[in-house]
A protein has these predicted regions:
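Acidic/histidine-rich, surface-exposed loop or edge segments in extracytoplasmic proteins
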Residues: 12-16, 53-61
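Periplasmic OmpA-like peptidoglycan-binding domain that tethers envelope proteins to the cell wall
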Residues: 95-169
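Short, low-complexity, glycine-enriched hydrophobic/amphipathic alpha-helices that associate
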Residues: 1-31
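Extracytoplasmic/secreted proteins, especially bacterial periplasmic and envelope-associated proteins
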Residues: 12-13, 28, 32, 70-77, ...
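Conserved beta-strand core positions
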Residues: 50, 88-90, 130, 156
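Periplasmic peptidoglycan-binding/anchoring modules of Gram-negative envelope and division proteins
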Residues: 38, 59-94, 121, 151, ...
Length: 175
């Protein structure tokens, strides 16, 4: 389903008091992220992680992995939020619609995720806390037989997860 944790690496739910502390931090960051043009923000993993979806149409031209100028303003604000919240790990996933072959879509989805990754690095976000991956057309969220559905399926999803330090700090605070 739509709210399923896409990244297998999304991690176990911490739960309890420590999970509530992490959830509060994620609530604050989610509120910040909701101000960004073109970003759809939802909390996942019982509120302990954030999923931000950027429609590829906002970021890229068709069949392109070059960020357009309009998307840069959104990603600048996104990078700023990541820098203000350093105790998180960031997973960037590229997705395409089903138009074209896997031979085109799979590398395109990787290049799109990598473009976002490289742009965030250029804005000062540490590459050590980020990873990226492309899924081609294997994880549609809408019907590929309609133009609107294909538009929804062309997207970059970014998961913001508590890193080991945030989890450790929350567990100590919860004691």
């Amino acid at each position: 389903g739509r709210g399923a944790a896409v990244g297998a690496g999304i991690g176990a739910i911490i739960g309890g008091a420590a999970g509530a502390i992490i959830g509060n931090k994620m609530d604050k960051q989610a509120a910040e992220l909701e101000q960004i043009e073109g970003a759809q923000v939802e909390k996942v993993n019982e509120g302990e992680a954030i999923k931000v979806t950027f429609e590829s149409g906002i970021l890229f031209a068709t069949n392109s992995s070059t960020l357009n100028s309009a998307s840069r303003a959104s990603l600048d604000k996104f990078a700023s939020s990541l820098q203000n919240n350093p105790d998180t790990d960031v997973e960037i996933y590229g997705h395409t619609d089903s138009t074209g072959s896997d031979a085109i879509n799979n590398p395109l989805s990787v290049r799109r995720a990598e473009s976002v990754y490289n742009y965030l690095i250029s804005k000062g976000v540490s590459g050590l806390r980020m990873s990226y991956e492309g899924f081609g057309s294997t994880q549609p969220i809408a019907d590929n037989s309609t133009a609107a559905g294909r538009t929804e399926n062309r997207r970059v999803e970014v998961f913001i997860l508590p890193n080991a330090k945030m989890i450790q700090d929350a567990k100590q605070q919860a004691q």
